[in-house]
Amino acid sequence: MEAAGYDLIVAGAGPAGSACAITAARAGARVLLLEKDHFPRHKVCGEFVSPESLELLRGLLGEKQLSYHTPVSAARIFVDGKTLAFPVSPAAQSIPRFELDARLFQAVQQAGALVREGVTIQQVRHEGAFQVETTHETFTAKAVVNATGRWSKLTQFEVVNKQNWLGLKAHFSEASPPQSVDLYFFTGGYCGVTPVDANTVNACAMVRADVARSLEEVFASEPRLLRRSRDWQPMFPAVTTSPLYFHEPQTEADGMVLVGDAAGFIDPFAGDGISLALQSGTLAAQMLTPFLRGKYSLEQARLEYQTAYRKRFVRAFRNAARLRTALAAPRWMRSVALTVAAMPGIGQMLVRGTRARSL
């Protein structure tokens, strides 16, 4: 059965897809947002929103503001028995995806877009108008935005790293956790720990599959993390995702505009994944709006988005990749790098280098 046409169909209702749908709907577009899951749900994520995107997030949420969040005012890096600490100023926020995604999804509906949960997209065809085929219906639209994540079946890219990496995440009880994002590095991976509230932390790891396949194995891989986690009690079963692959950011595939992890997956230790999702989704909607209003072609809109995306985001991806290489270097080289990073102002400069330029 073929359904009515739309100006824009957004595939995927994570932060990137919801930001895109909200922005386009507020600009007057007829928007359909399709999501394969149901809300609320947990996602593998460090749940860290950098300060550069907090104002954008508040604007997107409108009346659907978050009920709680926890400030993160410091960062600590634990590697090779050493600790590197520096302030995060202005403070970032720790926001559970369980609430964040659900509130953004509500804000999409508040903005006037139509939403469908539990819908799996089978394929997207571009023959003049776009035809989005789902299990039960086919929808048509002038443009399609792919926000279905880094390993979308709608697009496939050549990957940079061939190793099998996986992500794991769960919340654990911890009394009075520090208001810092703590990164524990070990051979074959790392684990980030951030406060969720006064009695809970989020532990999110990226690890090679030959090193660990559970969070308990991750914790055992770093002595200080093992000591810290001994009294932790899980708040829900761990969620996992794999494979984790990196590729050069790409803004378009098969005529669709790509946002969030579908466009590019930044190293999680950079702490900018949610911010990149919010900003790229918003930017895509802004660049598509003139096309949807008949002012210029879809090809020109995609080119405008590509140019703006590269200007604002590609530097962050490349700097994060350089840090990934440095962290995988021999121990003596890491020691030299840590000594340099500990110098006044260097740590903050490295963090700024992995941040997207704000809209």
Residue ranges and their predicted role:
Residues 16, 39, 151:
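Conserved Rossmann-like nucleotide-cofactor binding loop
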Residues 9, 13, 25-45:
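Glycine-rich FAD pyrophosphate-binding loop
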Residues 123, 210-288:
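FAD/FMN-dependent oxidoreductases across multiple families
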Residues 2-16:
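Beta1/beta-strand and adjacent pyrophosphate-binding region of the FAD-binding site
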Residues 53-105:
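A conserved beta-strand/loop capping segment in the N-terminal third of enzymes
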Residues 107-232:
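Predominantly flavin-linked oxidoreductase catalytic cores and closely associated redox partners
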Residues 286-359:
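C-terminal helical "tail/cap" subdomain of flavin- and related membrane-associated enzymes
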Residues 38-58:
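Conserved N-terminal glycine-rich FAD pyrophosphate-binding loop of Rossmann-like flavoproteins
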